[in-house]
């Protein structure tokens, strides 16, 4: 005004609600972020999500947008997915120890087209119920990979993945796990991948 510059200030109000609904929403969002980080840390899963038709600008945002609504309360559930929809398979006899994950798998469709293709078995483990005497970890997830080549159309094949030292130390701090598994092959386009399955279980300490 009249060649002069005036500044006005006012006190801002940005109160954060502590209602149960708002707290749960924030907790769910933070846990969805951790879930997406864990899935996105596996290179083949990241590549599969990146080129999927799921809404989002990157693999990470696609994982987030797809999974946010699937969380049960504030925790990952069996309905959450570490891969977009793909070919189906059966999984049985899940076993997780502080050293490894083991599961028996069998394809349920497109067997002839998928036989003898070498897949990467991707495991993402959501950890819960930390032992009271163990240091709290800020990232309660572990990941592991292995190989799987379907050769039998009527029998289960065992797939086992071993944790590295960092993942093993993390798993040892918890007593329960939700194990997610999905298969990927990105050697040539179009990429081939399965849907994902999950099971909740106790961790066997060895």
Feature locations, PLM:
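Long, polar/Ser/Thr-enriched low-complexity segments
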Residues: 1-90
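Charged linear interaction tracts used for macromolecular binding and regulation
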Residues: 52-206
């Amino acid at each position: 005004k009249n060649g002069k510059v005036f500044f006005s200030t006012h006190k801002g109000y940005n109160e954060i609600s502590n209602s149960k609904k708002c707290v749960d929403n924030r907790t769910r969002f933070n846990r969805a972020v951790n879930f997406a980080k864990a899935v996105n840390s596996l290179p083949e899963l990241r590549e599969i999500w990146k080129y999927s038709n799921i809404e989002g600008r990157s693999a990470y945002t696609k994982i987030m947008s797809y999974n946010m609504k699937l969380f049960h309360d504030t925790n990952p559930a069996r309905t959450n997915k570490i891969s977009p929809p793909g070919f189906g398979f059966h999984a049985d006899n899940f076993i997780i120890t502080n050293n490894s994950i083991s599961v028996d798998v069998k394809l349920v469709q497109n067997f002839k087209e998928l036989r003898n293709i070498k897949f990467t078995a991707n495991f993402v483990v959501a950890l819960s119920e930390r032992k009271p005497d163990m240091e709290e970890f800020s990232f309660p997830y572990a990941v592991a990979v292995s190989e799987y080549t379907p050769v039998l159309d009527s029998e289960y094949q065992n797939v086992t993945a071993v944790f590295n030292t960092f993942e093993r130390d993390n798993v040892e701090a918890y007593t329960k796990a939700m194990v997610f598994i999905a298969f990927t092959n990105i050697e040539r386009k179009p990429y081939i991948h399965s849907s994902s399955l999950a099971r909740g279980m106790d961790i066997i300490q060895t």
